[in-house]
Amino acid sequence: MYVPTQEGEFSVDEMRNVVLGKQIAKNEFKPWWACAAGFAVGAGSVLYIGAYENRPILSLAVPIVYATGFSFVRPTKKGIIKRHPEYQDNEYFVYGYQNKGRRKIMLNTIIGTLGGMVVGSVTSLALKSTGNITYIVRP
């Protein structure tokens, strides 16, 4: 039950629209691209910077900076209106959708980045243990 207690808080109808936006984003917004891009950055930085250039600290810093930057990304208002034209003039629905969407993007980015770093590290260790490292691009 929601009851606004201070001036400047959402009214009951406004909060209903915010919650509706969050619920719809939770059920239908699937930012798979954030996970895939995070995986590519995580694995690529560990393999290339960590193994090829032999800079392990930098290879860990790149995915962390990438994931931090992606924590500010959110679904666009234009994209939300395209999927839900009936809420075109409802800024509270858009706010709720963007709020939940931002969290899902951040979580998927972190999961993908950590997964990529693990896969990149295991692959790098496997390549180093065999001693036969063949790089596609030579300096």
Give the residues covered by each predicted segment.
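Periplasmic N-terminal soluble interaction domains immediately after the signal peptide in Gram-negative
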Residues: 1-3
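Hydrophobic alpha-helical membrane segments
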Residues: 5-139
